[in-house]
């Protein structure tokens, strides 16, 4: 890889994608505010700003840790300068929403630490002993479901808990609406995470990482994702009194678009994948518009 290509790769991965990933969290959070706040109460922008800023900062730190060691020092100051405005946004959001809202949002990413720790006891019939394994190994190919649940708890539940504290009549908040938005978020983030696993199948096979794609193959995985997304969206929509036709169309269109991208565009295609990431959880917002609260 030439130096200009390497530079573009770092800029895309360390700066562009974190912002896009941060924006990806907004549709579920906006949907959560829609089903939670009273009709005569204005939408609460600071919690959305705080969620966006924290998501960007977490992703920037994650991408910085993945940089080659020989280039990390060179790019460190640039990364710090880039992250500074988002630190300011996070401080602004915390000042308006309170420390408890910040801790609720940060508590979910900490589950990723638990995810990588050997905490699950497993008994071996062969040796007659009990050992502990990491949760991500215990979940096997369905570990992306754990990640999707974490995203749902961060983007929806943590936001809803804060919003209920700002309401004049929190007892009027729709628990059913909150649950539906949470389930939509888990459904579509599971689709997105699994599509990314299909894209990265060769890299995961080389690193002995178990995913749906490495365990069952690309075609069966895509078929399973299409069916599970359609059934998940349809079930949630019917429970909320929404349109079954719109549900099927929505799930089919987004599954088809993401599947085509995974099959035809490599991970190095930053802009197509960045655009797809931006729309990854848009179905959550679209679904919440058609559901009754």
UniProtKB/Swiss-Prot annotation:
Compartments, record wording: Membrane
Membrane topology: Multi-pass membrane protein
Cofactor section: Mg(2+)
Primary location recorded for the protein, binned into one broad class: membrane
Glycan-linked positions: 172, 208
Segments crossing the lipid bilayer: 10-30, 45-65, 75-95, 105-125, 142-162, 243-263, 269-289
A cellular component term, taken from the record's GO annotations: membrane
Superkingdom, taxonomy of origin: Eukaryota
Designated name of the protein: Prenyltransferase vviA
Taxonomic classification: Eukaryota, Fungi, Dikarya, Ascomycota, Pezizomycotina
Name of the gene: vviA
């Amino acid at each position: 890889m030439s130096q200009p290509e390497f530079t573009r790769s770092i800029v895309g991965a360390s700066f562009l994608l974190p912002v896009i990933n941060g924006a990806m969290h907004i549709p579920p959070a906006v949907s959560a505010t829609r089903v939670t706040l009273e009709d005569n109460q204005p939408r609460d922008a600071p919690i959305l700003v705080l969620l966006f800023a924290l998501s960007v900062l977490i992703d920037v730190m994650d991408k910085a840790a993945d940089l080659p060691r020989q280039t990390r020092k060179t790019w460190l100051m640039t990364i710090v300068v880039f992250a500074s405005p988002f630190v300011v946004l996070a401080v602004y959001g915390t000042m308006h929403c309170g420390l408890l809202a910040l801790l609720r949002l940060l508590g979910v990413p900490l589950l990723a630490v638990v995810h990588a720790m050997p905490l699950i006891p497993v008994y071996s019939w062969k040796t007659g002993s009990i050992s502990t394994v990491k949760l991500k190994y215990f979940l096997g190919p369905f570990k992306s479901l754990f990640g999707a649940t974490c995203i749902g708890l961060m983007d929806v539940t943590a936001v809803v808990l804060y919003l209920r504290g700002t309401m004049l009549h929190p007892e009027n908040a729709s628990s059913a609406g909150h649950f539906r938005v949470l389930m939509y978020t888990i459904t579509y983030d599971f689709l997105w995470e699994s599509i990314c696993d299909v894209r990265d199948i060769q890299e995961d096979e080389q690193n002995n990482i178990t995913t749906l794609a490495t365990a069952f193959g690309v075609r069966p995985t895509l078929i399973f994702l299409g069916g599970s997304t359609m059934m998940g969206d349809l079930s949630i929509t019917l429970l909320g009194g929404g349109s079954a036709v719109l549900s099927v169309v929505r799930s089919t269109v987004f599954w088809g678009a993401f599947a085509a991208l995974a099959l035809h565009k490599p991970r190095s295609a930053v802009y197509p994948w960045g655009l797809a990431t931006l729309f990854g959880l848009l179905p959550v917002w679209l679904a919440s518009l058609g559901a009754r609260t």
